[in-house]
Amino acid sequence: MANTTSAKKATRKIARRTIINKSRRTQMRGAVRSVEDAIKKGDREAALKAMANAEPQLMRAAQRNIIHKNNASRKVSRLTHQIAKLAK
């Protein structure tokens, strides 16, 4: 339990940020899932559209320290490679 005023305030700020970060993480996961679903269906156009939405969300999440930047880059890279395979 926080004793000082500043520690209590920090606890409140952390709670607010946690709610916001959970929301952003959920949106990001949904965007990635939509790309993966389009890839499973073999629909390249839908996958490209979904990827255009998912990539900025992943990079924004990395920028805001919701996920690590290498994690975001790895996900973008893997999804891009899977979409490229659909063209073949």
Curated annotation (Swiss-Prot):
One of its GO terms (cellular component) is cytosol. GO terms for biological process: translation. InterPro entries: Ribosomal_bS20, Ribosomal_bS20_sf. Binds directly to 16S ribosomal RNA. Belongs to the bacterial ribosomal protein bS20 family. PANTHER family: 30S RIBOSOMAL PROTEIN S20, SMALL RIBOSOMAL SUBUNIT PROTEIN BS20C. HAMAP family: Ribosomal_bS20. This is Small ribosomal subunit protein bS20. It comes from Bradyrhizobium sp. (strain BTAi1 / ATCC BAA-1182). The gene is rpsT.
